[in-house]
């Protein structure tokens, strides 16, 4: 059975439901440990029924008339709630934007390494920002950079879609890829 928390101040209101002796109503609508409706009984009867099966009497709906109370193991109930929250948190995937930086003169071997990284990021469900930096006289050959970004776009069509078309931003050209929606 739930033991009173020694660290909790007496009379302090918390967001947890009333348990056992904390219930202030004279009569309660009792729900058994198996979920079966027991009807309206006195608080003492409900507490006795909970003690017989060595479980807690927990006030489920406090503002009902009379309040609805259920016989359950409160600590196990809290544990199950925390487990559900953890599982829900694990299932969530935070989409991140990963950045890959290239130059217009990037060689074939280096291009393949960057392409593998892009595909890995897209398979993980992340977005990929591809930045192509131009230095010095490379600015005169922006069409080479655009051709390289279009080649990347063609190579990743199976895994991702272009969310932002290639565009110049100062001395660099950028493009944003997003993962393809799974069916």
From Swiss-Prot:
Family to which the UniProt record says this protein belongs: Belongs to the IF-3 family.
Keywords: Cytoplasm, Initiation factor, Protein biosynthesis
GO terms under cellular component: cytosol; membrane
Taxonomic path: Bacteria, Pseudomonadati, Pseudomonadota, Gammaproteobacteria, Moraxellales
Main location (coarse class): cytoplasm
The keyword Protein biosynthesis appears for this protein: yes
Transmembrane domains' residue ranges: none
Keyword Transcription regulation listed: no
Location of the region described as Disordered in the Swiss-Prot/TrEMBL record: 1-24
Subunit structure: Monomer.
Identification of the protein by name: Translation initiation factor IF-3
Organism the protein comes from: Acinetobacter baylyi (strain ATCC 33305 / BD413 / ADP1)
Pfam families referenced in this protein's UniProt entry, alphabetically: IF3_C, IF3_N
Localization of this protein: Cytoplasm
Compositional bias segments (type: Polar residues): 1-13
GO terms of molecular function: ribosome binding; translation initiation factor activity
Summary of the function given for this chain in its UniProt record: IF-3 binds to the 30S ribosomal subunit and shifts the equilibrium between 70S ribosomes and their 50S and 30S subunits in favor of the free subunits, thus enhancing the availability of 30S subunits on which protein synthesis initiation begins.
Gene Ontology BP annotations: ribosome disassembly
């Amino acid at each position: 059975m739930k033991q009173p928390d020694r660290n909790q101040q007496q009379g302090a209101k918390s967001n947890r439901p009333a348990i056992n002796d904390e219930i202030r109503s004279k009569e309660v609508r009792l729900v058994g440990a198996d979920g079966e409706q027991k009807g309206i009984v006195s608080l003492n009867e409900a507490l006795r029924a909970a003690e017989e099966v060595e479980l807690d009497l927990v006030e489920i709906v406090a503002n009902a008339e009379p309040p609805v109370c259920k016989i359950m193991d409160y600590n196990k109930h809290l544990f199950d709630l925390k487990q559900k929250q953890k599982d829900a948190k694990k299932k969530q995937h935070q989409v991140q934007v990963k950045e890959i930086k290239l130059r217009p003169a990037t060689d074939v071997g280096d291009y393949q390494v960057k392409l593998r990284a892009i595909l890995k990021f897209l398979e993980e469900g992340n977005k990929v920002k591809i930045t192509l930096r131009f230095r010095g006289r490379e600015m005169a050959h922006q069409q080479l950079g655009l051709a390289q970004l279009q080649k990347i776009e063609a190579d990743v069509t199976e895994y991702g879609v272009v969310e932002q078309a290639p565009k110049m931003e100062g001395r660099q050209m950028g493009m944003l890829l997003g993962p393809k929606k799974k069916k």
